[in-house]
């Protein structure tokens, strides 16, 4: 599923790629770098979505990037159009989040300069992304229910893809 996400990010015109957490994948596209959660340097060893966001922001900050697009590994159906709209929304906000029957915080883009804010929220005990980012300028980007579909394995991804192709 990471391969599909990589292809969608690349097709959206992005040119720096990383996946956060877990173990490094062998034989994976070398342009898609593994970033360990530990890069966040919070020292607690706890795993959380917010720590993953903090790790992504820290990696982007250390590599001189201005913004990040963060997609959970279980949302591989996000379109290039939505990715581009998330990035464009950063012209007027600190964070842009996918919206489909509510905010979908595993699909977002953020300016790297929010890193210190996210770190402070994490150190204050917050772990929910939406609570940590609530006092920032947030844009909501409408997307389809398909894009927000939680896909937990390759077989499900293939089935959804086949069904989408048969509907065309």
Q: Language-model segments: what does each one mean?
A:
Residues 1-106, 112-126, 134-147, 151-155, ...:
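Nucleotide and nucleotide-moiety/phosphate-recognizing core
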């Amino acid at each position: 599923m990471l391969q599909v996400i990589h292809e969608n990010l690349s097709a959206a015109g992005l040119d720096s790629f990383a996946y956060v957490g877990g173990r490094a994948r062998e034989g994976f596209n070398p342009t898609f770098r593994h970033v360990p959660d530990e890069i966040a340097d919070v020292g607690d060893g706890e795993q959380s979505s917010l720590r993953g966001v903090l790790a992504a922001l820290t990696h982007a900050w250390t590599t001189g990037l201005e913004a990040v697009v963060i997609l959970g590994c279980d949302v591989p159906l996000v379109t290039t159009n939505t990715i581009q709209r998330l990035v464009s929304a950063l012209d007027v906000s600190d964070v842009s989040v996918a919206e489909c029957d509510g905010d979908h915080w595993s699909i977002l883009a953020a300016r790297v300069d929010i890193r210190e804010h996210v770190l402070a929220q994490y150190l204050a005990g917050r772990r929910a992304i939406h609570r940590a980012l609530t006092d920032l300028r947030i844009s909501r980007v409408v997307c389809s229910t398909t894009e927000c579909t939680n896909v937990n394995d390759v077989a499900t991804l293939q089935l959804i893809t086949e069904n989408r192709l048969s509907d065309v």
